[in-house]
Every structure is written in structure tokens, then in C-alpha cells.
Regions:
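A conserved beta-strand-loop-helix scaffold within acyl/acetyltransferase catalytic domains
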Residues: 1-119, 150
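Alpha-helical elements of Rossmann-like donor-binding domains used by nucleotide-donor carbohydrate transfer enzymes
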Residues: 14-17, 126-130, 155
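Generic hydrophobic alpha-helical scaffold/packing signal
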Residues: 19, 98-99, 132, 157, ...
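Alpha-helix boundary/interfacial micro-motifs
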Residues: 49-51, 122, 156, 163-164
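Membrane-targeting and insertion segments and their boundary/processing signals
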Residues: 102-105, 130, 134
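Conserved acetyl-CoA-binding loop-helix of GNAT-fold acetyltransferases
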Residues: 119-133
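Active-site/acyl-donor-binding loops of N-acyltransferases
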Residues: 137-174
Length: 174
């Protein structure tokens, strides 16, 4: 996110202090992937679907088309994983993360980011969803996802709009 948005984040000590200061009210969610394991799972899933397609024969053309689309999606993932320039694909790689601070009935997602190498994986959606679920379990009624850039072509707006947000504009913002 730093490189993509041309911003500079704070150092590790700052984030450790933030998490220590807010204790149980600080939520840190991180998504990981083991690329080597993911590739094996993709190949296994692809083989299972291909077996299912073969078993269908000429019947159920709609189901066959759906299964073929799944195979195509899996093949794209395999190409993505194979193209990654990662030293050790057997180690877990961070895909995305978010830090949320809960206070009373409100919570604020104050930092979030993703590894650009895995931009085609929807991991950030799960991180945000899990963060919001946990906040709700803590009694939070409203979670702020932070701002948007005020441009309808902004990818951040596209991402956040998938959570059915209530966009609040304050005087003097735009």
C-alpha cells in the first residue's frame, strides 16, 4: 500500500505501542497465504472438477459451463502463484492487514493495507468482514472505514462500497 499510494507509514515501534496502549480494544487482523500449499490445493481442486466434468458427459450443459468457468479461474490462480517472485513459497506470505480501534459503541479502522503481489485475491474483504464481526461481538454499533478520496473513480471507494456504507461528508472536506 505504501508504494501504490505513495505514502509513508510509521515504524514497527509505533504500531506495537498503539496495540499495547489500546489493549483489547485494538484489533489486528492479518491474512496470510502459503503459496506452495495454495498451488497444490488449486491443482487438486482442478482435478476434482475435471473429474466431475467428465462424469457429466453430455448432460447438464449449464453445470458443465459453470464447472469449466471454475477451472479457468483456478488456472488463473495457478498462473498468478507461479509468476510470483518469492524466495520461499513454502513460507506464509502476508496478503493484507487491518488495525481497528474500538471505543464505546464505535470503532475506527485506522490502518489497512495489502500486498500488491496478491491484489487479485479478495483477502482484504475477509479481513474487513472479520474485523467488523469482532467489533460487533464487542458491542460496537458503528464501524468507520475511514475516508475516501472524493473521486468516483477511486479504487478505495469501489472497495468500501461493497460493504454498503453510509458515507458521511463533513463541512469543508471536498
Amino acid at each position: 500500500t505504501e508504494k501504490r499510494k505513495n505514502i509513508s507509514l510509521r515504524g514497527r515501534e509505533y504500531f506495537e505501542n498503539l496495540l499495547d496502549t489500546f489493549g483489547d480494544n485494538a484489533l489486528l487482523y492479518i491474512s496470510y497465504i502459503n503459496v506452495e500449499k495454495a498451488v497444490k490445493e488449486c491443482h487438486s481442486r482442478k482435478e476434482a472438477i475435471e473429474d466431475e466434468i467428465e462424469a457429466l458427459g453430455e448432460k447438464s450443459p449449464k453445470k458443465k459451463r459453470t464447472l469449466l468457468e471454475q477451472v479457468a479461474g483456478i488456472e488463473k490462480l495457478i498462473v498468478l502463484f507461479d509468476s510470483l517472485e518469492i524466495e520461499d513459497k513454502s513460507k506464509n506470505q502476508v496478503i493484507s492487514a487491518a488495525i481497528t480501534i474500538a471505543y464505546g459503541k464505535h470503532a475506527e479502522i485506522i490502518y489497512a493495507g495489502m500486498n500488491e503481489d496478491f491484489a487479485k485475491l479478495p483477502a482484504q474483504y475477509k479481513v474487513f468482514s472479520d474485523t467488523m464481526k469482532k467489533a460487533q461481538e464487542m458491542g460496537v454499533k458503528e464501524v468507520s472505514m475511514g475516508g475516501i478520496e472524493g473521486d468516483l473513480n477511486d479504487s478505495l471507494l469501489g472497495f468500501k462500497s461493497k460493504f454498503a456504507p453510509n458515507i458521511v461528508e463533513y463541512y469543508g472536506e471536498f
